[in-house]
Amino acid sequence: MSTRDSARFSSLPLRASASITVSGLDPPLADTSRLCKLAFAMPSSPRPVRQRLTSVLSLILLCSLLPGSSFASAYNGRPKLIVVLVIDQFRGDYLERYRDQFGDSGFRFLLDHGAYFPNCNYNYANTSTAPGHSTLFTGAYSNGHGIVANEWWDQKKKKMVTSVEDDDTKLVGVAGDKPGASPHNLMGDTLGDELKLATQGKSRVFGLSLKDRGAVFPAGFAGDAAYWIDQQSGAWVTSTYYRNELPSWVQDFNSTRPAKYWDRDWKDAQGALLASTAHRKAKDGSGAGFYEVVGPTGFGNAYEFEFAKELVLYENVGRGPATDLLSISLSPNDMLGHQVGPDSPEMKQMALDLDRQIAEFINFLGHQIGLADVWIVLSADHGVASLPDAVKKLRIPAANLDARKLEAQINGAITAKFSAGHPAAYVKLEYPRAWLDEDAFAAVHIREHDAEAAVGEAMKQAGLRDYYTKSQLAEGEAPDTPMGHKYLNSYSPEGSWYVMGVPDLYTVGSSKGTDHASPYTYDTHVPLAFYGLPFQAGTYRTSVEPVDLVPTLASLLGINAPTHSVGRVLTEALAPAHHTTGPGEAKP
């Protein structure tokens, strides 16, 4: 049974003819049906009882005169806009760790006035950016949507390729003839795709991120646009999959906005310097670029939100005849977290900065659209391990492993077994997963099952705890345990032969810093929160999964869940309702 904290109705943003400042926000007031609910949830005050009763009775009288103002129908109709905030590498414990230091209008606004699920965990081992975003927007795990990693071995090209690169498309927004990106590797459709189908294309769907994969998968197959940045210049780009040229507003943004973020000092609340972009800039095209310099600072998230606001304004997002969907994948947390770990002062400051930036964006949405017409969802694609050096100080086993040395060790073991005296690159290791070159094994007459088993044993000898081969997972050969199920959910039939290594606790495949991509809670635990009129405010301590996000939204929208969705509708957090408008149609 869920535990629900009491909701503080008194500070919910509203929308009417007057203007009320609430919890540091000043959005236009919400619809009058929410105002009627407040008549029965007004906080105590020092005013005389008679005066307070008069105010309440006046509100009740007002409600009785309003059409369609019954309390149970407070959220009749669809929202004009759904915003999904995906914070890259944001562990589920961060919200509780820093809750007392957050303001009232950012994270705490969503937690206090939304449905908050603090016990949300991915039920698979592929805890990386591409699989995480795919899972959030398809409602499926890798065995459904097909995305198992950020990149993998392409047997035809004989090289590693990214999850979204598409040679049939071109990049738009930068000089040259570079390959573009698309969701062509997805095996299932997304929430945005189903929204498009239900509204005959009237809904508009956008994805943005500093990373291509963080923008492309949320936008889905039918998305109107996905935008990410050119890593050198910071300019926003897209792909010919979506359009052949950038809109004029994006071109204007690129001509002036990136320059604002160079030459800036990132400081903590006491004014102490955390990082300076001034000494690392490379505006001339040489050396470190925008992604590396500005990305892993609090300015990276500010840059994304600035672009998101422009997109809402110039594309009239939330102002069409049907519900629009906007995904904002905030990449800087991941870019910084790999370097300094989750317990560093820098990560704390980024969380505090992000709290303020989210508050500003919520305020923006309130003014532009009205929060009564907006649903906001907060989650993350994965967590991260603490720095192994810090873990070891507490006598907990941990290690930094050099993935390239491990790869050489595994290839050496396979060479000794199958082609002694004739070294070959049998394996490409993307820790903890090994991709096998099928041609190399074919040259020594080794079949898939035997090749994968040999690589798995070599991985154990190199220091991994255990392994699962692609062949094993295809046959469902995994223990009937929670951990076994995680690896079955991590399987995909697509791509070349592979072996999934099971890492030891707090053991990462980088010689310094930290990483993710494990089945352990520090990687699987992420936040999940919903804000909007359909959601009963409170904290729900049931165990939930990120796959529950899209079926919950789809049910409320009256549309089909994505084709491979396996999640459940989080009914415990939903308010009752009388009737609705048509599927996906925004209320007038």
Could you say what each language-model-derived stretch is?
Residues 2-11, 15-19, 23, 33-36, ...:
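Low-acidity, Ser/Thr- and Arg-rich intrinsically disordered low-complexity segments
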Residues 55-68:
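Bacterial N-terminal signal peptides
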Residues 79-91, 110, 136, 195, ...:
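Beta-strand elements within well-structured catalytic alpha/beta cores of enzymes
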Residues 95-144, 204-208:
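Short, structured active-site-proximal loop/turn typified by the sulfatase FGly-forming signature C/S-X-P-X-R
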Residues 102, 119, 145, 150-180, ...:
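Secreted, luminal/periplasmic, and some membrane-associated catalytic domains
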Residues 216-225, 284-292, 296, 311-312, ...:
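Active-site His/acidic residue clusters
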Residues 223-307:
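Long, well-ordered, tryptophan-enriched scaffold segments
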Residues 393, 401-445, 515-557, 571-580:
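Substrate-binding rim/cap in mid-to-C-terminal beta-strand-loop elements of soluble/periplasmic
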